[in-house]
From Swiss-Prot:
Family annotation (Pfam families): DXP_redisom_C, DXP_reductoisom, DXPR_C
Binding site for NADPH: T10, G11, S12, I13, G36, K37, N38, N122, E124, G202
Protein name: 1-deoxy-D-xylulose 5-phosphate reductoisomerase
Any single GO BP term: isopentenyl diphosphate biosynthetic process, methylerythritol 4-phosphate pathway involved in terpenoid biosynthetic process
Annotated InterPro entries: DXP_reductoisomerase, DXP_reductoisomerase_C, DXP_reductoisomerase_N, DXPR_C, DXPR_C_sf, NAD(P)-bd_dom_sf
NCBIfam families for this protein: Dxr, PRK12464.1
Pathway of action: Isoprenoid biosynthesis; isopentenyl diphosphate biosynthesis via DXP pathway; isopentenyl diphosphate from 1-deoxy-D-xylulose 5-phosphate: step 1/6
Keyword hit for Signal: no
Amino acid sequence: MKRLTILGSTGSIGTQTLDIVRQNPEQLEVFALAAGKNVQEIELQAREFKPQIIGLMEEKAARELKQRVADLDIEVVSGMEGLLRTVTDEVPDTVVTAISGRIGLEPTMEALKAGKDIALANKETLVAGGDLVMGTAQRLGRTILPVDSEHSAIFQCLEEDPRTLDKIILTASGGPFRGWSEEQLREVTPERALQHPNWAMGAKITIDSATMMNKGLEVIEAHHLFNMEYDQIDVLIHPQSVIHSMVQYCDGSVLAQCGRPDMRLPIQYALTYPTRWPNPFERLDLRGKTLSFFDPEDYDFPALKLAYACGKRGGTLPAVMNAANEVAVHAFLARRVAYLEIIGLVDKVCSEHDVLDATDLETILNADHWARIRTEELIHS
């Protein structure tokens, strides 16, 4: 029996993780759930999965939940301290980090220090603190298994000897606005940007997919997860989202992992590795399908170029890029900035940052904090 703490249980990845638990009650058990402030949803989860602890970031929401589940034997905690409580208890074996944003960095670090393995769906953790997180995992002998479909695909295609690896190829749908003119992009609304052609995801990652910043974050994540140089990480536009990523070896062979665009597949693999469990999910049927691939250089994706540049520069710059992007995306969703202003804001903040070595958590968090304040200043100016 594997016991789980699920961070972000009310979000897209979190609810799909619970679907895996629901279908495998003999193998998986929920120890703790954590979310932001969605009291109604997490109460339903509490009554179904009977966790021992629930953490909510918002204290008011935690107080309300405590009253709602008073009939259940559940400890309700709040804030970052409460979040850390859910990952450091001795009971859980694996922590699923499915919360969105840089806020996942601290609980991931504490979970590793507490001897937990990580099923990582929070790419911002590695973007902001990749060297620190991967170094901690290696030093403590803990495993970080990718949940992102692209990184799960790469992980499944890897051979034992890393010296045979030539490069990895991340695929991207290209989002809903591939090929649109600047005039068309000026008219993009949050509602239109939230309509992803293939995947059902949360709001922030859906906007990132539209701008291609999501793929940029994934390039940096792949650099850390697989210890690859940036010139060994390629991106291909693949609108059908059937091939989730590919690995090219030194002899020219290319291995690809294919599947339907269903996040439950990489989630389940991260929870069951190194074994595979049967499931009732719809199977991939390639009959009658045409798969196509395009060079992202054929389109104007400034976010992808910016992410490569920030990743190569390293230090605190990726954390700053990520923080500025989080603020800019949420401002767009709140109709405070236009769609085309998102990446311009991020680029401006990155250009103003004095890069430091990202050797400790405090330095990373300080850079993140500065970037958020500066981005807000630019939005208000």
